Amino acid sequence: PVEIILLKEWYVRQTHIQDRMRELIEEIEFHPVRNRQFLLDWMDNISIDWPISRRRWYHTEIPIWYSENEEYVIVPPAGTYVQPWRENPPAGSRVLRRDSREDVGSFEAMTETLGNITGEQKVFDTWMDSSNSNLFVSGYLNQPEIFDKAFPTALRPQGKEIVRTWLYYTLLKSALLLDKPGFQHVWIDGLGMDPWGRKMSKSLGNGIDADSVLECGAGGRTGSWKVKGPEKTVNLKANKIGSECFRLWKACEAQVGDDFHINPEEIEQKYFGVLTKLFNVARFASQFDVPNDLDSIPDDLNIEDEWILYEFNAVMSEVKSAWTNLDIYTATQTLKTFGTGILPSH
């Protein structure tokens, strides 16, 4: 049996604004489009308001003090960080009626009425802080001239496992405060999976430290990783990866929104040779002088050179279109095909 203990908590209203949020979400471009449904499915199951207070030791303190008779609350000036459990209200704090939130005066003028005040000991839920991210980077409250130009924030890149938390609560806060969509674009990527197709997690012990993969090959260092498989622990090894090979692998391995397998051995086998070939092509091309006029094509080119320039322009057009649509996979695959196949052969 589970014993249910009723405790008073702080909540943010959210059930009343769900329809308006859906309207605002329609203004956001999702990448891939299908992953918008993750968010909508979660919203379909919201039936209560958002409990934002937690009983923990470490996090952002809820900036509230209570009067002795608990009929009033004291709040600090906007933007002030306080620790109510150990500090008194700072200068400029205001007193509100607890039931109506009516502002009834300054803390300094009402100290006798309030009696012995008590500071809130609870802290905010972690997503209460994290949902400020788009507002913060856009200059909300601090840089209004920038905020007017920068909001809605251009892009939110994130994984699909936190759509119901980070993405949803960020959009909720933007809707409540500003009645605007929180972003112009939302990029929802897949999850990193182990070689057996399982999500990497601490509980399974099947994770691979990214720093060790990036350092593999630097200064002659080799990489070795012990990964817990379904039946036994497997030792994976690689000699040369590094940051550039790692980036190329991630860009080429999966389309946006798809899960991707992380196996250092395969990263080295598939992409180190590709990276080396691209480097050699670039080094060969760098031996020649850059023409003064890159916009016009010389009249005396042979048919093979005219063909490769046509192919190059087609590649650049496709790459620019892909980048504009935040499709890194298509852009990188197109460059890889041209840079390791068509151009070297020419």
Annotate each language-model stretch with its function:
Residues 305:
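Aromatic-rich surface patch/π-platform used for binding flat ligands and interfaces
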Residues 1-291, 308-346:
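Structured secondary-structure scaffolds
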